[in-house]
Amino acid sequence: MSQIFADRRAAVPARVISFCGAALAVWAGLAVQPAMAVDPPVDCGRALGLHFWSSASLISDQTPDGTLIGKPVVGRSLLSKSCKVPDDIKEDLSDNHDGEPVDIVLELGSNYKIRPQSYGHPGIVVDLPFGSTEETGIAIYIDFGSSPMQKVGERQWLYPQKGEVLFDVLTINGDNAEVRYQAIKVGPLKRPRKLVLSQFPNLFTYKWVFMRGTSQERVLAQGTIDTDVATSTIDLKTCRYTSQTVSLPIIQRSALTGVGTTLGMTDFQMPFWCYGWPKVSVYMSATKTQTGVDGVALPATGQAAGMASGVGVQLINGKTQQPVKLGLQGKIALPEAQQTESATFSLPMKAQYYQTSTSTSAGKLSVTYAVTLNYD
């Protein structure tokens, strides 16, 4: 029994070694076969879209994010009408694929940042180069007009119009497809100024993709799109008010002799800075006011113990010496904003205590007015 077992063990390794040797010989034979050469995509060159955008637009702090600005710029004939193909596929295209469609894919240039949201619009939003979007809150909105933007890859979209194989070249017929550009408000206005939208080099790379979505997919040709938007001026106008706290003098409760009593009038200045000669006005509002009396704000309900009651604060316009009407109906024009491009000025105001009830109590008093700038 032991001898038979030994013979079988000896035979097994011999077969294994022989089999491996044959397998190695076959592998070595496959390794020396040359790979088929594939030529790179043909360079179709640059396509320049030169457009004119003559409208001037006014943007302010109150312009909502997502607002499209001015008129859209429409670009057609953005792509080369025809392109050559790599030499290694010319004969196959001419013999077997004449007249077949070729997809055109646009890929956003690497120097352009896509915003994560398009603010309800069907296209894409792209930041301006050189950090301009962070300063101005303005970006560029791009879409394909009436055609949807079909995303086919990272930073890639399918151009609405197809090309086709014409013997051994690629061609595109007509100018039906379009790419539209428009400024869009996307953030706060940190640096007001005149913004001129101009050159956008290498905005897109366009690729002629043959048999896209199959195992034989291949980019046969490609080029770049430079967009030059001329005379596109956006006036980034703004006014800023610096929040402030105004302190009124301490008064004696005994001095409050009846509803309508006013005491402790205090002068102060409301500081403003405006840029770009805006036509602007300002108005004040308060959460809780005294019915039937202009300019009187009351303390918020639910204040801590020890706060005064039966008294509010009334605002007086320092120019007219009249109580300020609260809300939009009481807006005050600021003509000083239009005197220079960058204007710093103050609006004279006064504040005073105003007795609102026959029942009063001593303590601290705090009221808040909201200041709103309104651009005409």
From Swiss-Prot:
Database matches in Gene3D superfamilies: Fimbrial-type adhesion domain
Q: So which domain of life are we looking at?
A: Bacteria
The alphabetized UniProt keywords are: Signal
Q: What is one cellular component GO term in this UniProt entry?
A: pilus
Signal sequence, renumbered to the chain: 1-37
GO biological process entries: cell adhesion involved in single-species biofilm formation
InterPro entries per record:
Adhesion_dom_fimbrial (IPR000259), Adhesion_dom_fimbrial_sf (IPR036937), Adhesion_dom_sf (IPR008966), Bact_Fimbrial_Adh_Pro (IPR050263)
Ranges annotated as spanning the membrane: none
What protein name applies here? Protein FhaE
In its UniProt entry, the species of origin is given as Bordetella pertussis (strain Tohama I / ATCC BAA-589 / NCTC 13251)
